[in-house]
Swiss-Prot record:
The gene is ycf18. Belongs to the ycf18/nblA family. It is found in: Plastid, Chloroplast. It comes from Galdieria sulphuraria. This is Uncharacterized protein ycf18. GO terms for cellular component: chloroplast. The keyword NAD does not apply. InterPro entries: NblA, NblA_sf. Although originally identified as Cyanidium caldarium, these sequences derive from Galdieria sulphuraria. It comes from the Eukaryota. Keywords: Chloroplast, Plastid.
Amino acid sequence: MNKNYNSYLGLSLEQEFKLKLYSQIVETLNEKQKXRLLLEILKYMLLNDNILKYLIKYTNLK
């Protein structure tokens, strides 16, 4: 990823480092492994969305 994109997302230095490590790991995977990983990541993103929606809906903010 280019530096401007990371800055736009507001990634911390630690997150940028982790992203670099993960990208190196992904490069070693074959296509089938990459697809499984992608689906697993999408699943966790959807679960995260559900958690955020639940918290927004049921958190009593005053």
